[in-house]
Amino acid sequence: MAIEILVPDLPESVADATVATWHKKLGDTVKRDEVIVEIETDKVVLEVPALSDGVLAEVVQAEGETVVSKQLLGKISTAQEGDVSSATLKATNEPTPSDRQNAAIENSHNHNADQSPVIRRLLAEHDLQADQIQGSGVGGRLTREDIEREIAKRQAQQVKQEAATEQNTISTVAYSARSEKRVPMTRLRKRIAERLLEAKNSTAMLTTFNEVDMQPIMTLRKTYGEKFEKQHSVRLGFMSFYIKAVVEALKRYPEVNASIDGDDVVYHNYFDISIAVSTPRGLVTPVLRDCDKLSMAEIEKQIKALAEKGRDGKLTVEDLTGGNFTITNGGVFGSLMSTPIINPPQSAILGMHAIKERPIALNGQVVIRPMMYLALSYDHRLIDGRESVGFLVTIKELLEDPTRLLLEI
């Protein structure tokens, strides 16, 4: 008996998807609920599990193929493995990209079968074997950091070897030895490119700047951070302060929490904040909903959960849908200042940056304070200068006096 492997139902906003990775090759034994193939949309990666024990007998759609909801991907034979005739396994004589990838991971399959999809993909992409890397996770499981350390170690060794080789052969290296590599863009990267270009072409985007003294928040975190973490089991970060300040500013300036729909302006009376998160696949913006009703501990917990889902490739379409305003924190990468791009149909985005000690004038004295630049990009079709500057000044004042955030004044 053959069990069909079908593309799962795609959201209404997603027209099609791409076959990203086959984790099994023809003839491999599969177990019920084991992930056998991943489907990539322009937002998330969907895992397709086996519906029954059996053998992968047919692959209809190879990696890189475009598919739609309920389209046939392959078939699983539920007969005994020994009874499956090789004649029923439909494969071409010429190795496909899927065959080559499966061959690369076959030797390490038994060691990484219980790893997350993201870990398995990283192992395959960098030609690594799980049994050659010391895992630091629970039960010896590999983490992303383990793989990154291994990649960095190998790269360092490669650089050292290349330097030694170059020293001996530099005089004989020809100019023609330079090379290029062309790879197709992922669906997510193509979607990001489309959205960024759309934002630049369809909005009257402008950016206004300010700076904030972060000393009060840093003092508060130093004083209460340990107690906060002990009581709530989550670290007190900066983002909860940023979100609380943004929500209060949005209440005072509803134009920033609005969007343009044709000739109408839609004012939102709820506060769903998108948070820019860097993932192995690219930058995504999962949404924290009803932020005005969340405590700082709840905000920190939700941010942590969304960040972990992003790193593990577990974000759902629902996690990424909606949002009335976006916060992006380039400071985690060391950015001192930037002009963030609006995330349509939203009308504004707030950029936070690196906190740096700088000399400033305070009460007639030059003092050293931890300062951070703020950048608000906004759609000038809807938001005027008075509202944009007032919005940013409100955030500055709230962050410089965090007690007002807690008292909601």
UniProtKB/Swiss-Prot annotation:
Active site: 380, 384
Database matches in Pfam families: 2-oxoacid_dh (PF00198), Biotin_lipoyl (PF00364), E3_binding (PF02817)
Keyword Secreted listed: no
Cofactors that this protein relies on: (R)-lipoate
Pathway(s) of this molecule: Amino-acid degradation; L-lysine degradation via saccharopine pathway; glutaryl-CoA from L-lysine: step 6/6
Co-factor binding comment: Binds 1 lipoyl cofactor covalently.
Biased composition (Polar residues): 83-107
The Lipoyl-binding domain, residue ranges: 2-77
Gene Ontology, cellular component aspect: cytosol; oxoglutarate dehydrogenase complex
Database matches in InterPro entries: 2-oxoA_DH_lipoyl-BS (IPR003016), 2-oxoacid_dehydrogenase (IPR050537), 2-oxoacid_DH_actylTfrase (IPR001078), Biotin_lipoyl (IPR000089), CAT-like_dom_sf (IPR023213), E3-bd_dom_sf (IPR036625), PSBD (IPR004167), Single_hybrid_motif (IPR011053)
Modified residues (N6-lipoyllysine): 43
Domain Peripheral subunit-binding (PSBD), first and last residues per copy: 114-151
Molecular function via GO: dihydrolipoyllysine-residue succinyltransferase activity
UniProt EC number: 2.3.1.61
Disordered: annotated span: 83-114
UniProt keywords, alphabetically: Acyltransferase, Lipoyl, Transferase, Tricarboxylic acid cycle
One of the protein's GO biological processes: tricarboxylic acid cycle
Top-level enzyme category: transferase
Catalytic reaction list: N(6)-[(R)-dihydrolipoyl]-L-lysyl-[protein] + succinyl-CoA = N(6)-[(R)-S(8)-succinyldihydrolipoyl]-L-lysyl-[protein] + CoA
NCBIfam families attached to this UniProt entry: PRK05704.1, sucB
Quaternary structure (record): Forms a 24-polypeptide structural core with octahedral symmetry. Part of the 2-oxoglutarate dehydrogenase (OGDH) complex composed of E1 (2-oxoglutarate dehydrogenase), E2 (dihydrolipoamide succinyltransferase) and E3 (dihydrolipoamide dehydrogenase); the complex contains multiple copies of the three enzymatic components (E1, E2 and E3).
Biological role stated in the UniProt entry: E2 component of the 2-oxoglutarate dehydrogenase (OGDH) complex which catalyzes the second step in the conversion of 2-oxoglutarate to succinyl-CoA and CO(2).
UniProt similarity note: Belongs to the 2-oxoacid dehydrogenase family.
Protein name in the entry: Dihydrolipoyllysine-residue succinyltransferase component of 2-oxoglutarate dehydrogenase complex
